[in-house]
Swiss-Prot record:
Gene: tilS
EC number per UniProt: 6.3.4.19
Organism this protein belongs to: Leptospira interrogans serogroup Icterohaemorrhagiae serovar Lai (strain 56601)
Reactions the enzyme catalyzes: cytidine(34) in tRNA(Ile2) + L-lysine + ATP = lysidine(34) in tRNA(Ile2) + AMP + diphosphate + H(+)
This protein's name: tRNA(Ile)-lysidine synthase
Keyword S-adenosyl-L-methionine listed: no
Function, as annotated: Ligates lysine onto the cytidine present at position 34 of the AUA codon-specific tRNA(Ile) that contains the anticodon CAU, in an ATP-dependent manner. Cytidine is converted to lysidine, thus changing the amino acid specificity of the tRNA from methionine to isoleucine.
CDD domains per the UniProt record, alphabetical: TilS_N (cd01992)
Key words of the record: ATP-binding, Cytoplasm, Ligase, Nucleotide-binding, tRNA processing
Biological process annotations from GO: tRNA modification
One cellular component term from this protein's GO annotations in UniProt: cytoplasm
Disulfide bond entries: none
Subcellular location per the Swiss-Prot or TrEMBL entry: Cytoplasm
Binding residues annotated for ATP, in chain numbering: S37, G38, G39, K40, D41, S42
Source organism phylogeny: Bacteria, Pseudomonadati, Spirochaetota, Spirochaetia, Leptospirales
Length: 433
C-alpha cells in the first residue's frame, strides 16, 4: 500500500523541482541511489523521489539502507524493509554491517566508520548502475556539521562542506526551507523509524543538535541563509553532459551479459535490466513481467518475451537481448538504386549492380563450402534474435541467395557470402541514422 502525498506537500515538491532546475538534466538521465535510514529526513527524500517518479520526471531510483548493528533492534529493521518493500515499487538494496566492531578495529568513531562504509558501498552501487548518490542532508545538518568540524580544528573548508553536488553525491533537501520541512512533517502521516542512537548524548553531533543548535536558533540564526551564503546552486560539470554524449545515438538493441545477471540478487538484477532499458529510452519492467522474465532466465532455455515496448530474447547460449519495438532493426530495409546503397538498422553498404536486396523467404538456402545450408540455421548459429531474422536483408542474383548481410545487424560480424565470386564493397556508417 502506497503512502498518500497531500496537496500541500505536492505544491512544495513542485516548487523544489523548479529550484533544482540546474540538476534536471542529471536527474532525468541517470538513476538515483537513495540513501534511506528510515528517519524523518530520508523519509522526505524518499517521498520526493517517489513523487518525481510518479510525475514521470525521472527513471526509477534504487533504495539503499544500511543496518549499522547499533540499534540491536531486529524487529525495527524488519519493519523498515517491509515498509519500503510494500510502499515503493523500486529496487532495494538492504545491507547489514557490524559498525561498532569495525570502528574499534579502525580506531575511528562510530559516525566516521558508518559514514565511510556507507559511502564506499553507495559509490560501488552508483558506479555499477551509472547513477548518482542522493542523501537527505539539509541546512540544519549543515549547521551541525560546521560546528562539529570547527570543534575538531577545521578551517575555512568547514564552511564549504556539504555542497549541492560533489563526488557524485546530490543533496536536494537543501532546496527545502526548514519551514517547508516542518510543514511536510506535520501534514503527512508517513512511517518514521528513528534510530535510538540519535537520542544518545554519547555522540558529539547529538550534543550539538540537542544543546547548541537550539540556543543559536533562539538567538536568530537562520540555517537556510547561512548555507546559501557559502554555497551556490550550479549545474554540475560532468562528462555525462558533454556535447558528444548529449548527441549520442540510441542503439537499436543492447545485450546484457548473462553471467553478470546470474551473479546479481533479484533486486539488483531488476535494477540492472531497468537501467539498460532506460538507456534505450524505455520504461522499467513491471514487477509481474520481471517475475516472468526471471523464471525464463532460470530455465536456461531459449525464449522470446515481449511487453508493450520491448522484445526480450535469449538463446540457450547467448546473452540477453533487449530490442525496442521501434528499433530500426525491426523495420524493412531501404534501397537507393541510383547509388546502389542498402540501408538498414542505422548502417548502410554499397552493393554490386548485379545483386538485388531482398528479405529472406522461408526455407531459403545459401551455397557455402560446397554445401547448401538453410539460412535459418545460419542465423540460429550466429545467435541473431528471432524477431530480427525476418527483417535481415539478403542479396540475391540469378534466383539464388548470394549474401546474408550480417554486417548490417552488427558491424563486428562479417557477411556470409555464397560460393561464387561476389564483389562486396566496404560497409560505412550512415551519419545521423
Amino acid at each position: 500500500m502506497r503512502d498518500k502525498i497531500s496537496e500541500s506537500t505536492q505544491k512544495i515538491f513542485h516548487a523544489v523541482w523548479e529550484r533544482i532546475a540546474p540538476f534536471h538534466e542529471m536527474i532525468q538521465s541517470r538513476p538515483a541511489v537513495l540513501s534511506y535510514s528510515g528517519g524523518k529526513d530520508s523519509s522526505i527524500l524518499l517521498h520526493f523521489y517517489f513523487w518525481l517518479w510518479i510525475e514521470k520526471k525521472i527513471p526509477a531510483p534504487c533504495i539503499y539502507h544500511l543496518d549499522h548493528s547499533i540499534r540491536f533492534n531486529l524487529e525495527q529493521e524488519k519493519k523498515i524493509f517491509e515498509y519500503a518493500d510494500s510502499t515503493f515499487p523500486f529496487s532495494k538494496i538492504f545491507k547489514k554491517k557490524n559498525i561498532p566492531a569495525l570502528s574499534r578495529r579502525l580506531g575511528k568513531t562510530l559516525e566516521e566508520t558508518g559514514r565511510a562504509f556507507r559511502y564506499k558501498d553507495l559509490k560501488k552501487i552508483s558506479d555499477q548502475y551509472e547513477g548518482y548518490i542522493v542523501t537527505g542532508h539539509h541546512s540544519s545538518d549543515y549547521l551541525e556539521t560546521i560546528l562539529l568540524n570547527l570543534i575538531r580544528g577545521g578551517g575555512w573548508n568547514s564552511l564549504r562542506t556539504l555542497g549541492w553536488y560533489e563526488k557524485n553525491r546530490f543533496r536536494p533537501l537543501f532546496a527545502f526551507s526548514q519551514d517547508e520541512i516542518e510543514t511536510i512533517l506535520q501534514s503527512e502521516f508517513w512511517k518514521i523509524f528513528e534510530d535510538e542512537s540519535n537520542n544518545s548524548d554519547e555522540y558529539l553531533r547529538n550534543r550539538i543538535r540537542s544543546y547548541i543548535i537550539p540556543l543559536l536558533l533562539r538567538e536568530g540564526a537562520n540555517p537556510d541563509r547561512i548555507y546559501k551564503n557559502f554555497h551556490r546552486i550550479e549545474k554540475p560539470v560532468s562528462k555525462i553532459f558533454s556535447k558528444k554524449n548529449s548527441d549520442h545515438k540510441i542503439p537499436s538493441f543492447l545485450k546484457i551479459d548473462i553471467w553478470v545477471l546470474n551473479d546479481l540478487s533479484q533486486r539488483e538484477r531488476k535494477f540492472f535490466i531497468d537501467r539498460y532499458l532506460r538507456s534505450l529510452n524505455l520504461y522499467p519492467t513491471t514487477r509481474n513481467f520481471f517475475r516472468d522474465l526471471t523464471d525464463l532466465l532460470q530455465k536456461e532455455n531459449s525464449f522470446s518475451l515481449e511487453n508493450k515496448e520491448t522484445w526480450f530474447w535469449k538463446s540457450t547460449s547467448s546473452d540477453l537481448y533487449l530490442i525496442p519495438k521501434n528499433s530500426p532493426c525491426l523495420r524493412e530495409f531501404r534501397f537507393e538504386p541510383k547509388e546502389m546503397v542498402l540501408k538498414w538498422n542505422g548502417n548502410q553498404k554499397k552493393i554490386p549492380p548485379d545483386l538485388i536486396p531482398d528479405l529472406c523467404p522461408a526455407g531459403a538456402k545459401i551455397r557455402k563450402n560446397g554445401m547448401s545450408i538453410e539460412i535459418s540455421e545460419i542465423l540460429r548459429q550466429k545467435e541473431i534474435p528471432v524477431p530480427v531474422r525476418k527483417m535481415l536483408p539478403i542479396l540475391r542474383g540469378e534466383r539464388k541467395v548470394d549474401v546474408i548481410c550480417l554486417s548490417l545487424w552488427d558491424p563486428k560480424i562479417g557477411d556470409i557470402v555464397a560460393d561464387r565470386e561476389v564483389e562486396i564493397l566496404p560497409d560505412f556508417q550512415e551519419p545521423g541514422v
